[in-house]
């Protein structure tokens, strides 16, 4: 990206807000899924909220997910994790309802080549489906014959195929959902700025962070932003932020 390019008027007006003598209730470092979620929640509760990202929004891990909103099928092996499975199913249903233009049901087929393999998978997936009681199921788990499996998966290895099992989860566009959350936060009054990395901190008398120093990559101008609360949502770069505050801390 050309950081010498002229920025748009909308960005300039946002940056001007940083020059106001204002103490923000919430300051968030990181514009990925976690930061966006915090921004929505804080702004919706009436807190003055500002968010900074050193790159573009959703440029890190939040754009490199599996693209799945699954109900936790991989956790079915351990009964101690079944509570987590149930929680994942509830969240999956909420996302399907709140963002149907981004999150949608998706079928998955497990081809089976061993005797009783279909029955083995079917038993586990039926239990998985049963845990979606109360309207949280996405689709019906079903046996598939070898012919039907080949019809639905034309590229599957046909030699020795006994059949298949189809179950349902959900798929989504991670970056689009992230940006949708950011737009929601902005509509609630949050100030969101990308390409504005954090470059330093100032502490108050009690050791708490009272000022966060940031720098606009386009203009090179630095700003000192007063805040009451800081959220480190920098993802894999969270340790870098922690060491800026306390160089002696152990890494996560």
List PLM regions with ranges.
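Helix-loop-beta segment of a Rossmann-like dinucleotide-binding subdomain
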Residues: 150-188, 209-215, 221-225
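Flavin (primarily FAD) binding-site architecture
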Residues: 232-247
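Short hydrophobic core segments
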Residues: 28-29, 225-235
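Core beta-strand elements of the Rossmann-like FAD/NAD(P) dinucleotide-binding domain
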Residues: 22-24, 219-229
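Glycine-rich FAD pyrophosphate-binding loop
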Residues: 43-65
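Dinucleotide-binding Rossmann-like beta1-alpha1 core, especially the glycine-rich loop
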Residues: 67-152
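A conserved short coil-to-beta-strand element within the FAD-binding core of flavoproteins
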Residues: 194-210
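Extreme N-terminal leader/targeting segments of oxidoreductases
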Residues: 1-26, 41-45
């Amino acid at each position: 990206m050309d950081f010498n390019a002229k920025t748009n008027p909308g960005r300039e007006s946002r940056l001007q807000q940083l020059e106001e003598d204002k103490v923000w209730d919430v300051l968030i470092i990181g514009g990925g899924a976690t930061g966006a979620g915090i921004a929505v929640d804080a702004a919706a509760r009436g807190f003055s909220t500002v968010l900074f990202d050193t790159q573009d929004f959703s440029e890190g891990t939040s754009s490199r997910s599996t693209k799945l909103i699954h109900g936790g099928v991989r956790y079915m092996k351990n009964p101690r994790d079944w509570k987590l499975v149930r929680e994942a199913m509830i969240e999956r249903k909420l996302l399907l309802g709140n963002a149907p233009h981004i999150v949608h049901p998706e079928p998955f087929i497990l081809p089976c080549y061993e005797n009783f393999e279909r029955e083995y998978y079917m038993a586990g997936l039926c239990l998985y489906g049963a845990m979606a009681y109360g309207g949280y199921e996405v689709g019906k788990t079903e046996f598939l014959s070898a012919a039907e499996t080949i019809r639905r998966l034309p590229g599957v290895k046909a030699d020795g195929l006994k059949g298949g099992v189809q179950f349902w989860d959900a798929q989504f566009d991670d970056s689009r959902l992230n940006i949708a959350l950011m737009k929601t936060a902005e509509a609630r009054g949050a100030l969101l700025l990308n390409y504005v990395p954090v470059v330093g901190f100032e502490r108050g008398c009690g050791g708490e962070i009272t000022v966060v120093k940031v720098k606009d990559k386009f203009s090179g101008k630095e700003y000192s932003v007063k805040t009451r609360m800081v959220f480190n949502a920098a993802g894999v770069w969270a340790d870098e932020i922690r060491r800026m505050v306390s160089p002696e801390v152990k890494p996560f």
